[in-house]
A protein has these predicted regions:
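A nucleotide-sugar donor-handling region in carbohydrate enzymes
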Residues: 182-207, 324-380, 410
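C-terminal alpha-helical cap of glycosyltransferases
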Residues: 118, 201, 519-533
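Conserved catalytic-core segment of nucleotide-activated headgroup transferases in glycan assembly
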Residues: 230-234, 238, 362-408
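Short phosphate-binding loop-to-helix
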Residues: 53-98, 106-114, 271-281, 294-295, ...
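A short, well-ordered alpha-helix in the C-terminal region of glycosyltransferases
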Residues: 505-520
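Acidic donor-binding loop of glycosyltransferase active sites
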Residues: 436-447
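Active-site and donor-binding regions of nucleotide-sugar-utilizing enzymes
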Residues: 224-226, 234, 240, 251-259, ...
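Conserved core of the sugar-phosphate nucleotidyltransferase
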Residues: 82, 86, 104-194
Length: 533
């Protein structure tokens, strides 16, 4: 069977100058349709109809033939039917003629072949690419606007509504004339939304470029009571920054899926590194993010061998594996010992909801205290603080105590809600709202400390473990009162008393120190570096 593909590509595009030869994702626009036609298992010959010397060079270099288009067929009023008919070699007998537009770069060759096969099997005269796009639409009839529907329904319940995409028209050669390519027996072949891009505007160009450069993203993250769950929160924030839905992996031996909370992201448990590596070999991700604390060089070498073309980004990693990473972000540390390491608070990823809250106003007196030690609190600081604040001497102050998803003995701590000036909450979704209702904070040296600083809340901080002792930002020099790892109760309570009675002027000074750091721009900095790899 002889099947001819014709790609019309004139030079005179006015809306987007030089449209057909513009570079998109490393190739001229017309490259994609020529490539599909040449790779097709069913198309036997490929001809490009053009009046562009540049298009002819591209086509011939790729191995396609060219039909130089006469000037009389290059005007805006000339129909595509006449152009296609002119390009057909009349000295050969053809079974099908496939019109392929150069403005559909996202079409897949598998879809093209499936449509040709569908046309042949169903003995169609013409088959047109289309997308099913049901909408509540209207038409004009006798000068009035009338609905194209009988009943208003949600989109998924509306009848099919096919829109031509322009990607291809498969026609029996016998029906193609200078006036038409449409025979009597016509059908449409549905293509995916991603393959339906038809470049007519600069906005379409941007969509096509993004679609052709689609990333395959994976995130490997673990969190529990021992290591904390700030990694989980950060992974979910990063996942929202990509224009694809990442696969989020976690080790089922280390992480309870409940710590992810309510999310529609794709969560995939793995039973150890061996299973993760096997999946990576099959998936071949283009971007792989580790948020698992310290990595070994063996782990990183193994990962790179599975996904050799991927860019690997590590967060909060101070292990030897960092030398094999393409990027390392350590917002909690200050050491930038290698060029790929970006350390310090300017790479902190602020939660989206915090961006909508202004720093608190420092009041004359402290009346309300925020207490939270992250998602896990392995030192049980929450328990110790609750025992302190129920003393009669603190009855005139209000305390908000927030417990995280990985905290143990939550039910016992919720019993403290019986005290009128104490509010104990578990796994809240309105953290910035709660924080901004308070005058001071008491926290550890992880994510919550950064959140309090973002809102300009003077805070006391203590470390949960030896690793947190190395965290650089939550310190006295930046406006916190850091009192060490596992300080004695008398130190904690003494510092709290100092803050409760602290003057407005001193608290304002601490707030100024906290707000001197740009914690809100870290998300942008991180993603710019990732996207520019």
């Amino acid at each position: 069977m002889k099947i001819l593909a014709i790609i019309p590509a004139r030079a005179g595009s006015k809306g987007i100058p030089n449209k057909n030869i513009r570079i998109i994702n490393g190739h001229p626009l017309i490259y994609y349709s020529i490539k599909n036609a040449l790779k097709s298992e069913l198309i036997t010959d490929v001809i490009i109809s053009t009046d562009s010397p540049e298009v002819r060079i591209i086509a011939e270099q790729m191995g396609a033939k060219c039909k130089w288009r006469d000037e009389s067929l290059c005007g805006d009023a000339v129909t595509l039917d006449a152009v296609i008919y002119d390009a057909i070699p009349k000295d050969e007998k053809w079974d099908y003629v496939v019109t392929m537009q150069p403005t559909s770069p996202t079409l897949k060759v598998e879809t093209l072949d499936a449509a040709i096969k569908y046309s042949i099997e169903n003995n169609l005269d013409t088959c047109i690419s289309a997308i099913n796009a049901p909408h509540l639409s209207w038409r004009e009839e006798n000068g009035q606007k009338v609905p194209n529907y009988e009943k208003r329904l949600n989109r998924q319940f509306l009848p099919a509504n096919y829109l031509e995409t322009g990607a291809f028209v498969v026609s029996k050669a016998s029906v193609v004339t200078a006036e038409t390519r449409i025979g009597k027996k016509v059908d449409v072949y549905e293509v995916s939304e991603q393959e339906a891009v038809d470049i007519d505007t600069f906005a379409d160009l941007r969509v096509a470029a993004m679609s052709l450069n689609t990333q395959k993203v994976a995130i490997y993250v673990n969190g529990n009571n021992k290591r904390g769950i700030g990694h989980i929160y950060r992974a979910l924030e990063i996942a929202d920054e990509f224009y694809v839905k990442p696969d989020i992996y976690y080790d089922s031996n280390q992480t309870d899926p409940k710590v992810f909370g309510k999310t529609t992201h794709i969560l995939k448990p793995v039973d150890g590194i061996a299973e993760l590596f096997q999946i990576c070999k099959e998936k071949q991700y283009t971007v792989f993010i580790n948020d698992i604390l310290t990595t070994s060089i063996d782990y990183m070498i193994g990962l790179k061998s599975c996904i050799p073309n991927a860019k690997i980004i590590n967060f909060e990693d101070d292990g030897e594996g960092i030398i094999k990473a393409d990027l390392v972000f350590n917002a909690l540390f200050e050491d930038e010992q290698f060029p790929q390491i970006h350390a310090g608070e300017k790479y902190y990823i602020c939660g989206k909801t915090f961006m909508f809250y202004e720093p608190i106003t420092i009041k004359e007196k402290v009346t309300k205290v925020f207490i939270s030690f992250g998602g896990a609190d392995p030192q049980n600081y929450s328990d110790r603080l609750l025992e302190m604040i129920i003393k009669p001497e603190y009855k005139d102050y209000q305390f908000v105590v927030v417990l995280g998803r990985a905290k143990y003995n939550v039910d016992a701590l919720l019993e403290y809600n019986k005290y009128p000036n104490v509010e104990v909450l578990y796994d809240v979704s309105n953290m910035p709202e709660l924080m901004t209702s308070c005058d001071i904070g008491i926290t550890s040296r992880g994510r919550t400390g950064y959140e309090l600083a973002t809102l300009g809340i003077p805070s006391i901080a203590m470390a949960q473990n030896h690793r947190e002792e190395k965290h650089g930002f939550v310190c006295n020099e930046n406006g916190f009162s850091y009192i060490g790892l596992n300080p004695a109760d008398e130190v904690i309570e003494g510092t709290m008393k100092m803050y409760l009675s602290m003057s407005q002027k001193t608290r304002q000074h601490y707030q100024d120190m906290l707000l001197s750091h740009d914690l809100r721009g870290g998300r942008r900095r991180v993603m710019n570096l990732i996207n520019n790899l």
